[in-house]
Amino acid sequence: MFRKGKKRHSSSSSQSSEISTKSKSVDSSLGGLSRSSTVASLDTDSTKSSGQSNSNSDTCAEFRIKYVGAIEKLKLSEGKDLEGPLDLINYIDVAQQDGKLPFVPPEEEFIMGVSKYGIKVSTSDQYDVLHRHALYLIIRMVCYDDGLGAGKSLLALKTTDASNEEYSLWVYQCNSLEQAQAICKVLSTAFDSVLTSEKP
């Protein structure tokens, strides 16, 4: 295995974009990222909506992904250090190097369904549910190139528990950065829809 393949392919134009429920503006502050491709981040820690609603928000978009692993029940103090996209990416990198998370996921594919209720990850026959992430418990979603040179991307979710006392990180592998960005976009639309519907 290419453990030493963690060297990132350098690019003369490392770009990044941040998708936020507050704003859809491009944030180039992540330009120093040692990744060869775009990083997209969804910051859901917001109380404002961009005002864009989607009449199809009740539908569930489905994506085929693989499950890399999770780091669960991080203390509040640890979670506070994972505010930005780069914080999450660096934390996952270190966890992989320390053996807490694998570099490559098992071969089994799962179905990730994204709707206004949140995210559901189930087996490919959709008979068993692996994870459920309620929309209101999702704090941030980040997608980025895994750096292994196979064109795969990682999708990382930061969630909290109902009492807001602990954080967890969930890592999934997508077939491409485009697929990962599509998941971020659907989730962003779901947040917009819910926040818009809550307005008086």
UniProtKB/Swiss-Prot annotation:
Residues 34-43 have a biased composition (Polar residues). Residues 139-141 are annotated as: Interaction with ITGB1. InterPro entries: Integrin-bd_ICAP-1, PTB/PI_dom. Residues 11-29, 47-57 have a biased composition (Low complexity). Residues 1-57 are annotated as: Disordered. Residues 58-200 form the PID domain. Residues 136-139 are annotated as: Interaction with KRIT1. Phosphorylation at Thr-38 seems to enhance integrin alpha5beta1-mediated cell adhesion. The degree of phosphorylation is regulated by integrin-dependent cell-matrix interaction. GO terms for biological process: activation of protein kinase B activity; biomineral tissue development; blood vessel diameter maintenance; blood vessel endothelial cell proliferation involved in sprouting angiogenesis; cell differentiation; cell-matrix adhesion; cellular response to fibroblast growth factor stimulus; cellular response to vascular endothelial growth factor stimulus. A motif (Nuclear localization signal) lies at residues 6-7. The modification Phosphoserine is found at residue 41. The modification Phosphothreonine is found at residue 38. Keywords: Angiogenesis, Biomineralization, Cell adhesion, Cell membrane, Cell projection, Cytoplasm, Cytoskeleton, Differentiation, Membrane, Mitogen, Notch signaling pathway, Nucleus, Phosphoprotein, Transcription, Transcription regulation. One of its GO terms (cellular component) is nucleus. Disulfide bonds: none annotated. It is found in: Nucleus; Cytoplasm; Cytoplasm, Cytoskeleton; Cell membrane. Residues 1-10 have a biased composition (Basic residues). GO terms for molecular function: GDP-dissociation inhibitor activity; integrin binding; protein kinase binding. It holds the Pfam family ICAP-1_inte_bdg. Interacts (via N-terminus and PTB domain) with ROCK1. Found in a complex, at least composed of ITGB1BP1, KRIT1 and RAP1A. Interacts (via C-terminal region) with ITGB1 (via C-terminal cytoplasmic tail); the interaction prevents talin TLN1 binding to ITGB1 and KRIT1 and ITGB1 compete for the same binding site. Interacts with KRIT1 (via N-terminal NPXY motif); the interaction induces the opening conformation of KRIT1 and KRIT1 and ITGB1 compete for the same binding site. Isoform 2 does not interact with ITGB1. Key regulator of the integrin-mediated cell-matrix interaction signaling by binding to the ITGB1 cytoplasmic tail and preventing the activation of integrin alpha-5/beta-1 (heterodimer of ITGA5 and ITGB1) by talin or FERMT1. Plays a role in cell proliferation, differentiation, spreading, adhesion and migration in the context of mineralization and bone development and angiogenesis. Stimulates cellular proliferation in a fibronectin-dependent manner. This is Integrin beta-1-binding protein 1. The gene is ITGB1BP1.
